[in-house]
């Protein structure tokens, strides 16, 4: 299949608005679980998921945490400006960014841009009983976003504390409602740890401490990766063919322990969510790049959109097994005295893609004509219609707060 020539209209289905879950269930793990096993479709309840997994398998979770990325400023004229944080600029490191005090810069999307003529925006609010004034100054365009410089007048307050006080949690636009206080809890996974996402890795929302304990009791090995989900995850495919769609870039971090566990499991894993898929499959291509040069920079390990389909990396992949690719990354960490790999990926996974590491997938039900639906179709060798027809006919709830599926090709 010529992946680049795929027509997105071939990945459409009718999704009535009433099938989109606007709110989560009261109990996360009581969601429905669609089971696709070797072409057969059935269903169960999510809290029984361990019964459908092979004992001793490796399950990989994305431990990213959604930040309160929406900042609202009211101009003296009354105009409301929304500054939506996309990724840290100065400092560029996520961990440093959230610890920084006094000032920082982000790449942002700006709502009501035409009303922000360049003046400094200000907002005063309370942080731990102290009054703090936050200033925002718009700088240059950076691609399709803007650099915004923030400064605040209390050097004892970190940017993380500031966001917790004044920021608003971004929820998906298709929910068509305002963020509620309850979303601060329900739109985070119970294992979220590393701040940086502007959208949740929603396949993980169904897991509770009880379900995680059941996995442990079933002998499932659990490991975590970090991929900070960008706003591009909601970016619709507007081009007729996907070769004209530009994928967003997302930051990833994988620790030595996870790589060692992957090697123990012969580079085979169950991925929780499409973000874990993109991380694990990107690791393979990073390992391929390292096959002939262990002295690349972490930036040079970035996986470009079409690398798995064409060019030098694609050609080299024919001679690199998934296990060898992961071993190469571990050798790279050893060579450079690192405990974790920090890089980024722009990978697009669509029909024609050959999965390297992911053998089973836990995922929600995705929007029509989305790159996430392409990823699922690639995993099921085109059999996505069967599960979506079943889900629509059997009262499954769709999208971020909806029900789940376990896919075993």
Language-model-derived ranges and their functions:
Residues 1-409:
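Surface-exposed, charge/polar-rich loops and edge strands
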């Amino acid at each position: 299949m010529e992946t680049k020539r795929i027509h997105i209209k071939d990945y459409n289905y009718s999704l009535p608005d009433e099938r989109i879950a606007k709110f989560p269930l009261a109990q996360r793990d009581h969601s429905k679980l669609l089971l696709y096993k070797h072409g057969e479709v059935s269903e169960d309840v999510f809290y029984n998921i361990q019964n459908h997994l092979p004992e001793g398998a490796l399950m990989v979770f994305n431990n990213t945490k959604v930040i309160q990325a929406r900042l609202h400023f009211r101009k003296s004229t009354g105009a409301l400006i929304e500054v939506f944080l996309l990724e840290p600029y100065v400092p560029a490191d996520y961990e440093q960014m959230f610890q920084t005090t006094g000032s920082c810069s982000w790449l942002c999307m700006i709502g009501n841009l035409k009303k922000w003529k360049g003046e400094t925006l200000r907002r005063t609010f309370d942080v731990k009983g102290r009054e703090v004034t936050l200033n925002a100054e718009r700088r240059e365009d950076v691609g399709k976003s803007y650099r915004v410089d923030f400064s605040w007048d209390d050097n004892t307050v970190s940017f993380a504390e500031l966001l917790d006080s004044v920021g608003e949690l971004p929820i998906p636009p298709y929910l068509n409602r305002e963020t509620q206080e309850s979303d601060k809890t329900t739109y985070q996974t119970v294992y979220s740890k590393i701040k940086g996402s502007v959208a949740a890795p929603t396949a993980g929302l169904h897991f509770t401490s009880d379900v995680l304990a059941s996995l442990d009791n079933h002998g499932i090995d659990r490991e975590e990766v970090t991929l900070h989900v960008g706003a591009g995850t909601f970016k619709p495919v507007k081009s007729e063919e996907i070769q004209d769609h530009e994928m967003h870039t997302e930051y990833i971090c994988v620790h030595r322990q996870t790589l060692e566990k992957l090697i123990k499991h012969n580079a085979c894993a169950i991925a929780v969510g499409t973000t874990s898929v993109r991380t694990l499959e990107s690791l393979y291509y990073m390992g391929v790049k390292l096959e002939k040069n262990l002295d690349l920079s972490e930036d040079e390990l970035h996986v470009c959109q079409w690398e798995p389909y064409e060019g030098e990396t694609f050609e080299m992949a024919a001679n690199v097994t998934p296990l060898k690719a992961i071993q190469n990354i571990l050798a790279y960490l050893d060579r450079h005295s690192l405990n974790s790999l920090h890089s980024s990926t722009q990978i697009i996974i669509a029909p024609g893609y050959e999965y390297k590491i992911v053998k089973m997938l836990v995922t929600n039900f995705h929007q029509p004509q989305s790159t996430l639906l392409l990823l699922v179709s690639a995993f099921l060798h085109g059999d996505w219609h069967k599960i979506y027809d079943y889900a629509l006919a059997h009262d499954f709830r769709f999208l971020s707060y909806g029900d789940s599926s376990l896919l075993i090709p």
